[in-house]
Amino acid sequence: MNIRHGIIAMSSTMLVPLAAEAACNTDYSWIDKSCERISDTWKNGDHDLYIPLWTHHLRFAYDNDKIDSFREFTWGLGYGRSRYNAAGNWEGVYLMAFSDSHSNVQPMLGYGHQWMMGPRSGLHAGVGYTAFLTSRADIYKNIPIPGVLPIASLNYRQYSVNTSYVPGGRGNGNILFFWSRVGF
């Protein structure tokens, strides 16, 4: 995937809330609730800037030559909308594009939910999940694939450092992906 594809993917994000809102009127109550939650977060949430930081490959899962071939510094950028719901938990809708371990652009469009602990006005932490669509050059040749991963965060006011664990086996997965989020 080249930079042009990344720009097209990021531009198309603006259409997601419109499509979600149009699809919210179904006969399935759980789909309606999920759709309304995503649409409401997008329309009423605060603006967020996402900055990918680091991709750490767990050393037990790879040999040294493979580790040496990876680029673990992750460049990229993202935009999202997020809010704290009535229960005090964080919800966000985002699009982020970043360099994968082989320096290819990897876009990711998703929804995240975290159950928060601690006062929002100070230091607080969260654990939850993200459901997303992504594409990678080395997996299905950039055909979008869905996924669900665990996430955790450490937050101070509108700043957060987040991580997600990508499970895998010997020679694949077993990755901790770190990014920051700044609300404005």
From Swiss-Prot:
Enzyme active site: 57, 100, 101
Cross-referenced InterPro entries: LipidA_acyl_PagP (IPR009746), OMP/PagP_b-brl (IPR011250)
EC number: 2.3.1.251
Gene Ontology MF terms in the entry: acyltransferase activity
Signal sequence coordinates: 1-22
Location of this chain's protein in the cell: Cell outer membrane
Primary subcellular site in the record, as a coarse category: membrane
Gene3D superfamilies attached to this UniProt entry: 2.40.160.20
Key words, A-Z: Acyltransferase, Cell outer membrane, Membrane, Signal, Transferase
Residue(s) at site: Role in lipopolysaccharide recognition: 66
Group of enzyme by EC: transferase
Any one cellular-component term (Gene Ontology): cell outer membrane
Catalytic activity: a lipid A + a 1,2-diacyl-sn-glycero-3-phosphocholine = a hepta-acyl lipid A + a 2-acyl-sn-glycero-3-phosphocholine; a lipid IVA + a 1,2-diacyl-sn-glycero-3-phosphocholine = a lipid IVB + a 2-acyl-sn-glycero-3-phosphocholine; a lipid IIA + a 1,2-diacyl-sn-glycero-3-phosphocholine = a lipid IIB + a 2-acyl-sn-glycero-3-phosphocholine
GO biological process annotation, one example: lipid A biosynthetic process
Record function comment: Transfers a fatty acid residue from the sn-1 position of a phospholipid to the N-linked hydroxyfatty acid chain on the proximal unit of lipid A or its precursors.
Family: Belongs to the lipid A palmitoyltransferase family.
Subunit composition and interactions: Homodimer.
Protein name: Lipid A acyltransferase PagP
